[in-house]
């Protein structure tokens, strides 16, 4: 083991689940999990709220010994009969990969007349981005995405892994979960800054559908600033370029921009697509250096740790994440106030409009008392 490598002992995201979410982003209609009935249950159920059917071959002890080829063929045919999908996904699990299941043989035998994205993956990878990459490689082979988009996604995955290892939940051997600072106290401090006429940046650097809730914080800050007559002191940035990303990701950006416009909130700087959270921070840093170096504070939502500290150090930082294990790394980076939106992800699945956040709701209520 090299000096830079660490052995992480807190639970880490699963490559199997990452593959499932990638199939969702590709607008796959049905994903078949080839493995035990309980594998990835929570996320499989949540994904069904987001428009993708997730079914399982339900391998048991007999299947572990004798294999599940026939069962996979059966479930492929049953899925086509039940759901009439335009694109089908087949995803491996620890069990099916350990026993050496050849999923491709089952797909050939079933011979569906639609594209099939086969993802041979298990949860034994240290970086869950491997599941994304495997799904994208198969999507490329199936003609669902082109080489240019694949290479773009591959680059983003490399950068995402780097960010997590340097400043995220993969940066330490063990990170205890935390709820962060009290939202009420931070809301009061933010209102003080606005009342004092301080100039602030509101930066949304969100990962895909999580933006539906992080965008509400941009709305709330804008609403409160407007009520105080200080809206002109804010500059809003967001990674909501609707031309970048896989199909579902581009759609998220379109919906969030639509809602910003409907609420009269101007996004002054578009900093990238909703899958570009690992690299959008570089653009933010450049913008601050060139145009906003005299600003006093920043409210950063989504993946704050992906934004370099170089041009933020002189600002008071209020950062909101949905990762309880992200609090300590952000504090160590120099983020003075760190908040956690608990259970954000389940609340942003299957939606197509901005969802109220805990901090947004708190800020609005505190402002009424100000």
Curated annotation (Swiss-Prot):
Q: What class of enzyme is it?
A: ligase
Any Pfam family matching the protein: Oxidored_nitro
Domain of life, per UniProt, equals Archaea
Query: What EC designation does it have?
Result: 6.3.3.7
Which SUPFAM superfamilies does the UniProt entry name for this protein?
Answer: Helical backbone' metal receptor (SSF53807)
Q: Which GO terms describe its molecular function?
A: ATP binding; iron-sulfur cluster binding; ligase activity; metal ion binding; oxidoreductase activity
Q: Which UniProt keywords apply?
A: ATP-binding, Iron, Iron-sulfur, Ligase, Metal-binding, Methanogenesis, Nucleotide-binding
**Which cofactor is recorded for it?**
[4Fe-4S] cluster
| Catalytic reactions of this protein | Ni-sirohydrochlorin a,c-diamide + 3 AH2 + ATP + H2O = 15,17(3)-seco-F430-17(3)-acid + 3 A + ADP + phosphate
Does Mitochondrion show up as a keyword for this record?
no
Give GO terms for biological process: methanogenesis
Listed InterPro entries: CfbD, Nase/OxRdtase_comp1, Ni-siroh_cyclase_CfbD
What exactly does this protein do? Involved in the biosynthesis of the unique nickel-containing tetrapyrrole coenzyme F430, the prosthetic group of methyl-coenzyme M reductase (MCR), which plays a key role in methanogenesis and anaerobic methane oxidation. Catalyzes both the six-electron reduction of the tetrahydroporphyrin ring system and the gamma-lactamization of the c-acetamide side chain of Ni-sirohydrochlorin a,c-diamide to yield 15,17(3)-seco-F430-17(3)-acid (seco-F430), the last intermediate in the biosynthesis of the coenzyme F430.
Its family remark reads:
Belongs to the NifD/NifK/NifE/NifN family.
Q: What NCBIfam families does the database record attribute to this sequence?
A: methan_mark_13 (TIGR03282)
Q: How does it assemble?
A: Homodimer or monomer. The Ni-sirohydrochlorin a,c-diamide reductive cyclase complex is composed of a NifH homolog component CfbC and a NifD homolog component CfbD.
**Protein name per its UniProtKB record:** Ni-sirohydrochlorin a,c-diamide reductive cyclase complex, component CfbD
């Amino acid at each position: 083991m090299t000096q830079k490598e660490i052995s992480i002992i807190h639970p880490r995201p699963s490559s199997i689940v990452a593959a499932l979410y990638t199939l969702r982003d590709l607008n796959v209609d049905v994903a078949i999990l080839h493995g035990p009935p309980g594998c990835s249950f929570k996320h499989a159920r949540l994904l069904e709220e987001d428009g993708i059917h997730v079914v399982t071959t339900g391998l048991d002890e007999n299947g572990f010994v004798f294999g599940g080829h026939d069962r996979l063929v059966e479930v492929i045919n049953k899925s086509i009969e039940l759901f009439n999908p335009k694109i089908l996904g087949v995803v491996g699990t620890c069990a099916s990969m350990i026993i050496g299941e050849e999923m491709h043989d089952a797909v050939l035998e079933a011979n569906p007349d639609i594209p099939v994205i086969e993802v041979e993956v298990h949860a034994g990878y240290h970086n869950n981005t491997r599941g994304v990459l495997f799904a994208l490689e198969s999507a490329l082979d199936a003609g669902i995405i082109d080489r240019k988009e694949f290479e773009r996604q591959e680059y983003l995955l490399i950068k995402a892994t780097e960010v997590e290892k340097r400043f995220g939940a993969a940066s330490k051997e063990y990170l205890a979960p935390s709820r962060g600072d009290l939202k009420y106290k931070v809301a009061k401090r933010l209102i003080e800054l606005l009342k004092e006429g301080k100039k602030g940046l509101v930066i949304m650097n969100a990962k895909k559908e999580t933006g539906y809730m992080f965008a509400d914080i941009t709305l709330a800050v804008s609403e409160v600033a407007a009520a105080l007559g200080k809206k002109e002191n804010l500059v809003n940035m967001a990674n909501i370029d609707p031309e970048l990303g896989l199909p579902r990701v581009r759609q998220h950006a379109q919906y969030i921009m639509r809602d910003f416009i409907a609420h009269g909130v101007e996004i002054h700087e578009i900093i990238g697509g909703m899958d570009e959270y690992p690299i959008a921070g570089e653009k933010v840093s450049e913008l601050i250096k060139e145009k906003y170096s005299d600003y006093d504070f920043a409210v950063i939502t989504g993946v704050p740790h992906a934004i370099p500290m170089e041009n933020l150090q002189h600002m008071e930082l209020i950062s909101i994440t949905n990762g309880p294990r992200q609090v300590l790394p952000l504090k160590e980076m120099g983020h003075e106030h760190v908040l956690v939106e608990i259970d954000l992800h389940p609340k942003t699945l299957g939606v197509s409009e901005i969802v109220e956040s805990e901090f947004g709701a708190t800020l609005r209520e505190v402002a009424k008392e100000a």
